[in-house]
Structures are given as structure tokens and as C-alpha cells.
Amino acid sequence: MNPLVINLQKCSIHDGPGIRSTVFFKGCPLECVWCHNPESQTYTKQVLYNEERCSKCEACINICPHKAIYKGETKICLDQDKCEFCETCLDYCVNNAREIVGQEYSVRDLVKEIEKDRIFYEESGGGVTLSGGEVMAQDMDFICGVINMCKSKGIHVAIDTCGYAKSENYERVAKCADLFLYDIKLIDEDKHIKFTGKSNDLILKNVKILSELGANINIRIPLIVGVNVDDENLEVKKMIEFLKPLNIQAVSLLPYHNIGKHKYDKIYKKYEGEELQRPSEEKLEEIKRLFEASNFNTKIGG
């Protein structure tokens, strides 16, 4: 089975240079507390439930051939283990309260979709960004097929990655992708495990590999009070020291937001980021100046 795509976002302006199409692949090895695309974490299809649209008529409960839908205390619930994605509940829901995320493409069909906006790429210096989930933790024959076909058509290819994938995957893609948008969240390993569920050893190793191979790298840092932002800028200073020896084109500082919070209800999952906060504008400017003082081309935002 080919990797699943949860969204092909057209006219994106925050995922690399110019106007771009961003392909969001499904499946990620990290579980970041602040993740704004929680439906992208699993590698399988999922049914999303929009409670605001649901009239509680219970037609879906009665019609589901696999008995996967049941009435909970306050809303209609779904047993994902029983669901076979037959779409019967979608067909019978007059309010469109359910949708399935995760669509399979062939390499050729996906590139055809990407190519539809080619005129915008050419006019703006844009292209396609392969994102996720985690694009580098997918079937790499498929991903390399997409990259190579796009490159053969003159389409600029960026890779948006959290860095947590096999090192050989990065070695394989380093010479054919035009740009890596590489997330660095924390240098402190214990904190990284606490907030993402995984060690950062592999992430820090892979960005060094890309640098050694001469890849074009833009570092992207989500800035979150209580995670990697504090009064003394301790974690930020660690990041700067780590990045100094590397071949880095630019640094993007991404202030925390919770605009994806509503998605958690749709997959029957609790949002664990309630206590997280966005840094003040003054703190963002302070951190920006720290990076600039070490000669990094730095901006706030994507």
C-alpha cells in the first residue's frame, strides 16, 4: 500500500519559497503535545467526527454493518478497531458530520495533482513541499518517485521534516530535494522525550548528516513558553551553539498556536496542550536578536 495523504493544500505561502502545494502525508513517529494535525499521527485511515454538525439522529448507529458506532454519554462515538472504512455512515449522514481522512495515490496521480498549479510555481519561484505527519518516515521508494518525477518536470521540491526517520532516508534524499525545512524543538533530551514521546538523538544526528552532504537547510523552531522558552533563554542558547557549526541557510521562529485544538475532538482524543503559551512579541524579538547575533538569517513566522 502506498503512503496515505490527508491533504493537498494549494496556494501555500508558509512552507518554503513562493506559492506552493503542500502534500501532507499521514503517519508520524512523534506525538508532540502541541501537534496541530493530530489526524496525521497514525499511518492508517481515520474517521473524523464533527459533533457540531451531528443532530444525534443515530442513523449511523443503526446502519453501520460492523457495529463500530455507538452512543456515548454526550456524543456519538466510534470504535476505530471495528471500523472497516466502508463509508456507509458517510452515505447516510444528512449533516455530513463524518469524513474519512487518508487517501491513497499512485506516484503519477499525485504528481498530476501537484502539476496543476505549475504556472503559480513558475511565476512565484514556488513548488511543492512534502510534509506530514512525517514524510521521511514513509515508503521511501514512493517518496523518491514523487521527488524525481517533480524534478523531471522542473518543479522545486522542499521536504518539511521533524528529523525522526532512518538516517539512510536523509542520505538518499539529500541530493535530489532542493530544500529541507527541518524542525528543531529541543536540545534537552529529557524534555524532548516528555513533550514528543521520543529522544532527539536521531533528529540531531540527521541534521548533521544533511549539513555534511551540502543540503540546503532552513531550521524551523516552534517557540513555546514552558517547553523551550524561559526567562534566561537557556534552551534557545543551546540550540544556537548546536547549530553554529552546521550549514544552515535560515532560521524560522514559529510562535506557538492552538488553532488545531478542535481537531482532537474529531478523533476522540484529549488535547494535552492546554497549559502551553505563545511567547510575547518582546520575547520573540529577543530570541530573534540572539540568533542574529550568531549570524543566522532569522525571521519570525514561516
From Swiss-Prot:
Record-annotated Radical SAM core domain positions: 14-297
Chain sites annotated for binding [4Fe-4S] cluster 1: C28, C32, C35
Leading EC class: oxidoreductase
Cofactor(s) required for function per UniProt: [4Fe-4S] cluster
UniProt keyword annotations, A-Z: 4Fe-4S, Iron, Iron-sulfur, Metal-binding, Oxidoreductase, Repeat, S-adenosyl-L-methionine
Gene Ontology MF annotations: 4 iron, 4 sulfur cluster binding; glycyl-radical enzyme activating activity; metal ion binding
Enzyme Commission numbers on file: 1.97.1.-
Textual note on the cofactor: Binds 2 [4Fe-4S] cluster. One cluster is coordinated with 3 cysteines and an exchangeable S-adenosyl-L-methionine.
Entry keyword annotation includes Metal-binding: yes
Catalysed reactions, semicolon-separated: glycyl-[protein] + reduced [flavodoxin] + S-adenosyl-L-methionine = glycin-2-yl radical-[protein] + semiquinone [flavodoxin] + 5'-deoxyadenosine + L-methionine + H(+)
Domain 4Fe-4S ferredoxin-type: 45-74, 75-103
Any GO BP: 4-hydroxyproline metabolic process
Residues the record lists as binding [4Fe-4S] cluster 2: C54, C57, C60, C93
Binding of S-adenosyl-L-methionine, residues: W34, C35, H36, G133, D183, I184, K185, H257
Metal-binding keyword on record: yes
Pfam families listed in its UniProt record: Fer4 (PF00037), Radical_SAM (PF04055)
UniProt similarity note: Belongs to the organic radical-activating enzymes family.
Role this protein plays: Catalyzes activation of the trans-4-hydroxy-L-proline dehydratase under anaerobic conditions by generation of an organic free radical on a glycine residue, via a homolytic cleavage of S-adenosyl-L-methionine (SAM). Is involved in the anaerobic degradation of 4-hydroxyproline.
Name by which UniProt lists this protein: Trans-4-hydroxy-L-proline dehydratase activating enzyme
Provenance organism: Clostridioides difficile
Gene that specifies this protein: pflE
